[in-house]
């Protein structure tokens, strides 16, 4: 019985699209000639909500990162790779789908050594180290955004970032369909820093809440990140709407008129699916500055305004919000552009591309 493995470790940005592909493959695996489907992730992700709700069995491994103990690393790394090889041979794994990150290395090496099909998903415009290393061995690769360097040494297509079924909108409402310009009510602003939260963004928005003119025009809902919730709640007013973590992002996207966020691929793809204008403050220390590259792509296409800063000075964001408050048409144009950048069928399209389905 042949099997498919989706290697999705690392952070939520790798896990969520992996689970999204699993949702589609669960329904199609027999049609494409495979009996079993598994997700393969790091043990530390056992409490990840997406993996807890996975539509297929999840297998666990403990591949160490390169930064672990330099003396024990070679031994631990080799042992874990061998364990992966033995497990995959036992399961008769014939296809490996890598979602990016160091945790996929053992799975991809299995595919190379035993000449199995290898498909890679790259979420960012600037591919990560693992993707760059293994593109040449891949049968196909799927990108969420157009790669900054188009010289990719394998067949690839830009298909969007796979999204979970529970996150997809029933209808993508543009800004003009959600905000009544005649009433001129407060703008609903969703603030989020990604799966881990972002202290910088939290502190910038807290400072903004100290400006009365901002509070009159904007209503903030801040997803602080679980680890930062207590810290933020101590700094803000009692009536501030703070949420530590949400497993139902759809309701927040439907509530929002626009978002203030980092520029991870998952967040950007979800916001685009909901036709949301974006104010992006990319994480300044991201590997290869990939968040800035993602953000600039959306800015170039009219869906986002990018703020490039490392400090917590709220004046930059204040100016942008003031610009928005006095130009509602800008938000409407950004909303239309955001929807044009979306790929709501990315999960299905990626599976069809990998397995050559009509």
From Swiss-Prot:
Main location as per UniProt: membrane
Residues that, per the record, bind UDP-N-acetyl-alpha-D-glucosamine: 11-13, 124, 164, 195, 291
Metabolic or biological pathway, per its Swiss-Prot or TrEMBL entry: Cell wall biogenesis; peptidoglycan biosynthesis
Role played: Cell wall formation. Catalyzes the transfer of a GlcNAc subunit on undecaprenyl-pyrophosphoryl-MurNAc-pentapeptide (lipid intermediate I) to form undecaprenyl-pyrophosphoryl-MurNAc-(pentapeptide)GlcNAc (lipid intermediate II).
A molecular-function term among this protein's GO annotations: UDP-N-acetyl-D-glucosamine:N-acetylmuramoyl-L-alanyl-D-glutamyl-meso-2,6-diaminopimelyl-D-alanyl-D-alanine-diphosphoundecaprenol 4-beta-N-acetylglucosaminlytransferase activity
Protein's UniProt keywords contain Glycosyltransferase: yes
Similarity comment text for this entry: Belongs to the glycosyltransferase 28 family. MurG subfamily.
UniProt membrane topology term: Peripheral membrane protein
GO BP, sorted A to Z: carbohydrate metabolic process; cell division; cell wall organization; lipid glycosylation; peptidoglycan biosynthetic process; regulation of cell shape
Gene3D superfamilies reported for this sequence: Glycogen Phosphorylase B (3.40.50.2000)
HAMAP family: MurG
The protein's Enzyme Commission number: 2.4.1.227
Keywords assigned: Cell cycle, Cell division, Cell inner membrane, Cell membrane, Cell shape, Cell wall biogenesis/degradation, Glycosyltransferase, Membrane, Peptidoglycan synthesis, Transferase
Localization per Swiss-Prot or TrEMBL: Cell inner membrane
Reaction it catalyzes: di-trans,octa-cis-undecaprenyl diphospho-N-acetyl-alpha-D-muramoyl-L-alanyl-D-glutamyl-meso-2,6-diaminopimeloyl-D-alanyl-D-alanine + UDP-N-acetyl-alpha-D-glucosamine = di-trans,octa-cis-undecaprenyl diphospho-[N-acetyl-alpha-D-glucosaminyl-(1->4)]-N-acetyl-alpha-D-muramoyl-L-alanyl-D-glutamyl-meso-2,6-diaminopimeloyl-D-alanyl-D-alanine + UDP + H(+)
Protein name, per record: UDP-N-acetylglucosamine--N-acetylmuramyl-(pentapeptide) pyrophosphoryl-undecaprenol N-acetylglucosamine transferase
GO cellular component terms attached to this protein's record: plasma membrane
């Amino acid at each position: 019985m042949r099997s498919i493995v989706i290697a999705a470790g690392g952070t939520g940005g790798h896990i969520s699209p992996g689970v999204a592909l699993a949702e589609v493959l669960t329904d199609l695996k027999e049609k494409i000639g495979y009996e079993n489907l598994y997700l393969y992730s790091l043990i530390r992700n056992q409490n990840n909500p997406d993996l807890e709700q996975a539509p297929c069995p999840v297998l666990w491994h403990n591949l160490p990162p390169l930064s672990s103990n330099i003396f024990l690393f070679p031994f631990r790394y080799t042992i874990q790779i061998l364990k992966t090889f033995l497990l995959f041979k036992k399961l008769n794994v014939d296809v490996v789908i890598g979602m990016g990150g160091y945790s996929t290395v053992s799975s991809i090496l299995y595919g190379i050594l035993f000449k199995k099909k290898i498909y890679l998903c790259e979420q960012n415009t600037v591919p990560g180290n693992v993707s760059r290393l293994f593109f040449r061995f891949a049968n196909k690769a799927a990108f969420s955004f157009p790669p900054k360097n188009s010289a990719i040494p394998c067949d690839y297509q830009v298909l969007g970032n796979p999204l979970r079924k529970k996150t997809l909108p029933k209808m993508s409402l543009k800004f003009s369909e959600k905000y009544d310009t005649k009433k001129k009510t407060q703008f609903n602003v969703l603030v989020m820093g990604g799966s881990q939260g972002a202290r910088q963004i939290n502190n910038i928005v807290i400072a903004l809440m100290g400006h009365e003119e901002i509070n009159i025009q904007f209503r903030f809902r801040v997803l602080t990140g679980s680890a930062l919730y207590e810290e933020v709640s101590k700094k803000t007013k009692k009536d501030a709407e703070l949420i530590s973590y949400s497993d139902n992002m759809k309701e927040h996207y439907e509530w929002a008129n626009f978002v203030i966020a980092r520029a991870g691929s998952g967040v950007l793809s979800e916001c685009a699916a909901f036709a949301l204008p974006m104010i992006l403050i990319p994480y300044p220390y991201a590997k290869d500055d990939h968040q800035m590259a993602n953000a600039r792509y959306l800015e170039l296409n009219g869906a986002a305004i990018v703020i490039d800063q490392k400090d917590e000075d709220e004046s930059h964001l204040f100016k942008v919000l003031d610009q928005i408050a006095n130009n509602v048409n800008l938000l409407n144009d950004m909303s239309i552009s955001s929807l044009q950048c979306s790929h709501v069928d990315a999960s299905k399209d990626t599976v069809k591309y990998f397995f050559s389905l009509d």
